[in-house]
Amino acid sequence: ILTAVATGKEVNYEEIPTQGITKITSMDSSYAAHMGAAIKLFGTSVNKDGKIYLEVAPVLVDAKYPLYAVTDVFNGILVVGNMLGASMFYGSGAGKLPTASAVVGDMISAVRFGDEPEKIGWSSEKLEVHPAAELSRKYFARFEGSERAKKEAVAAAFGDVKFVTLEGKDEFAVLTGEMTGEEFDAAAAKVGGLRQKIAARL
């Protein structure tokens, strides 16, 4: 809905790449805590060079990221503009009072506009959706095996990365530099043993 309002075009939600949190494990949370970070479910909408990139997926963020502290029944929206810079909107997204407020707002709009509903700013023109994985971004990735055994393979495939290990585990993790999803998949295949990948904003 927000993308439709921002672009003035109709967005088919079925075209948006969507990944929930069912594949996020306790091990992922342990790594995040070790790094002073958290895993959040983000809806991402990016306008770059006239193309709109969309995605719903978990993202790893650290405490410096504005949406890091959004928890429980609260929702946050981070808007970044070329002139505005970063602006954040924060508030309750569930509960009887926020829900009642939204319902009353709809009732007031219905009374005010009657048979001519309030125009919310988008046409019937279809928006061409591009997967956000086509954008360059960092990735957090877990691999089976030891850092020592695979360090050279990781360096050859990914270049400069940050290694993260948890004591007593038969695996290790890395934080990559910026790359597209396709570039990540190709590099991970060279290393082998990928257990998890999560986009990161650190």
Residue ranges and their predicted role:
Residues T7-V11, P17-K23, V103, V164, ...:
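Short, exposed beta-strand "edge-strand" segments with a Pro/Gly-rich flavor and a Y/T-containing core
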Residues S29-I39, A86-A94, P98, F158-G168:
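Short secondary-structure transition/capping segments
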Residues I1-A69, F74-G76:
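Substrate-binding/catalytic subdomain of NAD(P)-dependent oxidoreductase enzymes
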Residues V11-E14, M35-K40, D49-A57, N75, ...:
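Generic structural motif recognizing short loop/turn segments at the entrances and edges of beta-strands
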Residues M107-L202:
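A conserved regulatory-domain signal marking ACT and ACT-like small-molecule sensing domains
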Residues I21-T22, I52, G95, V164-G168, ...:
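Conserved N-terminal alpha-helical segment that immediately precedes and caps sugar-phosphate-binding
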Residues Y53-E144:
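Catalytic, metal-anchored helix/loop core of enzyme active sites in primary metabolism
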Residues I21-T25, K96, A100, E147:
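Generic structural signal for well-ordered, non-membrane alpha-helical segments
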